[in-house]
Amino acid sequence: MIPATYSIRERLRDGRPIEIRALRADDETGMLAAVDRTNPESLRRRFFVTKRGFSEKEKAFFMNVDFINHVALVAEIDEDGRPAIIGGGRYIVVRPGAAEVAFVVVDAYQGQGVGGLLTRHLVELARAASLKELSADVLPENTPMRKVLDRFGFRIAHGLDPQVIHLTLPLA
């Protein structure tokens, strides 16, 4: 089991400190603030539909993680003396030994290595949990996310939807 207290200090490409940590129950406001700071096109690339708000059911799904079948990390940085969530990543077990990953990073921090840090930590946690494979569904135009996943060894696999690129990473 991945501890709900997981926390690692890292640095962005520009040298600023960042914390990659487990999502906590009290992070909902910070997560929603991060979504508000993310442009609609970035959210569409993450959710595959135009998204500006979430239903109560969606919020509950995103916040109710068990760190076994649903693992979620946030990227948090100090902004003007206050912690601010600037990104998040998660994996959800979709069948025994396999999980799907997804990420979102606030636009102002894209290109600073946040997505790569989240990916690295989720891959490490998935290996520690003895998962055999991670997968991600990415829109063809989401080149930045495709590049991040490619650096970690994700490769194109056959998916069900021709409008979406299905990537997989064997962990074993």
Give the location of each predicted region:
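Long, contiguous binding/interaction regions
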Residues: M1-A172
